[in-house]
Amino acid sequence: MLADEILELLQTKISANEFDCYIKQLKFNEKASNEDFIVFNATSELMAKFIKTRYAEKIAYLYEVKTGKKPEVEITSQTKLKNIKQNQVNVKQIKAQSSILNPGYTFENFVCGDSNQFAFLNAKAVADKPGVLYNPLFIYGTTGLGKTHLLQSVGNYCLDQGKVVICVTSDQFMIDFTTHLNSHSMTKFREKYRNCDVLLIDDVQFLGKTDKIQEEFFNTFNELIAKKGQIVMTSDRPAKILKGFDERLKSRFEQSIMADITPPELDTKIAIIIKKCEFDKIYLNKEVIDYIATNMGDNIREIEGAIINLNAYASLMRVEITLEFAKNTLKDLIKEKHENINLETIIEIVSKELNIKPSDIKSKSRVQNIVEARRIIIYLAKMLTTNSMPQIANYFGMKDHSAVSHNIKKINELMESNEIFNLRVTEIKNKILTKG
């Protein structure tokens, strides 16, 4: 059976202990599965949640390697199996209609901070008055910062107000388009997407693949806006640097309200962890919360995954989650920091590579090439050293860590929009790592 082959393949990619503790117990649920939706049963709800967080994506990838098609993978417990059978809709039908809105994504449980406040306020305003304010809305930022949460919060809020909501990823939109085109039923496709009150498109950057799909989306976009239908899109980059898009469609995107989400500051990460713990009824002491916030990087999904891992391990081993336990459990997940690399090393190498005096870096000079070099150093310091953002701010005599966030954001934007600059920064980073 293919499912057995997949688990055997997974066994070669993880430790024997991991396989015996978690994967060996999984039972393939043939009745609840199809080629697009794969279900495995675990021995308990807690175990199912942990395995899904840690291994579902790996299992889906192995299916793709074997079959050329990536399914959705669900790990469930026997107690929840009934609900899956009652609620499961064939994934082909889901992809041909809209993604199911996750009721857990609401404005109430979204943690707002300096890094996402503008996007949050715009999304809330759009939900309050769809088609009236800020239409269309374009939310952008790197992976794992909360774009999908905000998008679906708009959808759930509008759904509660009795609005017709279509929420799809760009991949689902493309599959839906192709299905209707091949079955000569484009009228139904257009009725669906052009007669809704709110259209939500997640990861719109992937629409830049096919001219026909772009043409269809362009016409859908125009008709919805003309009818005062609300459009909200998310992307991993600003509209102006999207690749592969027709200029007319790109121009429409650029006319949107642009709301970016940047990596969360420390206070926001702490608030996110506290909120997650409250929601899942998990107790973490302040030491552990601070440790996760400081060391887990900026990806909110990874932070939430770390909390689930901690709770699962602690429950299985029946121990309290102490700082030492957290450090030991999360050591493989914690983003590697290069303790032998410090700010002085980075300044020395960046100054040499960019032909700037090290003394100019810490000066108040606003000369463009010095400002850019300073920003690169701040960006690399956050990435490669153990220094916190407040420590970096203090080193450069900045008012607070928000100035550090601003400089990092500027470098990220440049790296996304300028391939030569991106390569230059990467080269410098590699030289620092080699020396460190």
Curated annotation (Swiss-Prot):
It comes from the Bacteria. It is found in: Cytoplasm. One of its GO terms (molecular function) is ATP binding. Residues 100-314 are annotated as: Domain III, AAA+ region. ATP binds at residues 144, 146-148. Residues 1-69 are annotated as: Domain I, interacts with DnaA modulators. SUPFAM superfamilies: P-loop containing nucleoside triphosphate hydrolases, TrpR-like. GO terms for biological process: DNA replication initiation; regulation of DNA replication. The keyword Chaperone does not apply. Oligomerizes as a right-handed, spiral filament on DNA at oriC. Belongs to the DnaA family. Domain I is involved in oligomerization and binding regulators, domain II is flexibile and of varying length in different bacteria, domain III forms the AAA+ region, while domain IV binds dsDNA. Plays an essential role in the initiation and regulation of chromosomal replication. ATP-DnaA binds to the origin of replication (oriC) to initiate formation of the DNA replication initiation complex once per cell cycle. Binds the DnaA box (a 9 base pair repeat at the origin) and separates the double-stranded (ds)DNA. Forms a right-handed helical filament on oriC DNA; dsDNA binds to the exterior of the filament while single-stranded (ss)DNA is stabiized in the filament's interior. This is Chromosomal replication initiator protein DnaA. It comes from Campylobacter concisus (strain 13826). The lineage of its organism: Bacteria, Pseudomonadati, Campylobacterota, Epsilonproteobacteria, Campylobacterales. The gene is dnaA.
